[in-house]
Amino acid sequence: MGEVLDVVVVGAGSTGLGISYFLKREAREHKVLDGGRIGETWRTQRWDSFRLNSPTIRSVLPGDSYRGPDPWGAITHHEFVSYLEDYADRHCLPVCTQTSVKELTRQNGLFRLTTAPGVLLARNVVIATGDQNRQVRPPASADLPVELC
């Protein structure tokens, strides 16, 4: 099975990439796995008009500083995906896309992650798969035109 990684991070969204940044900075041997592409849920599980619900300046990931025209504006999810991809590239983060974790078990004090390409062993696993991919509407909004929601 090969080497034992210090950490495997599951999820290549903003949290997973931010964790990877710090792991790399501390020279921890790790990989980031995502079943899709970087920021996959931002690509496929957001409605067309979705914008981040915080000012752009608050969405800057570790090791970066804000660059852009409107620090207090709200960027689209498409712009955020581009930022995530650029961030991973600029910081040379070890992201493995199209790599779903099929099974996670403990074996001899290590975590065993089964993926389509093979099995990984790690001392630690971080699950960073997100929780903000569902639209929530109050019941009273049912009578509003869909373009307002």
Annotate each predicted stretch with a short phrase.
Residues V8-V10, Y21-W47:
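Glycine-rich FAD pyrophosphate-binding loop
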Residues T76, T129-C149:
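Glycine-rich dinucleotide-binding loop and its adjacent helix/turn
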Residues G2-T15:
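Beta1/beta-strand and adjacent pyrophosphate-binding region of the FAD-binding site
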Residues T15, R37-I38, Q132:
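Conserved Rossmann-like nucleotide-cofactor binding loop
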Residues V8-V10, V101, V119-N133:
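Short hydrophobic core segments
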Residues L33, R43-V81:
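Glycine-rich active-site loop/strand segments that organize a redox cofactor
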Residues T97-F111:
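A conserved short coil-to-beta-strand element within the FAD-binding core of flavoproteins
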Residues H78-V95, V101, Q132-Q135:
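Helical element adjacent to the flavin cofactor pocket in flavoenzyme catalytic cores
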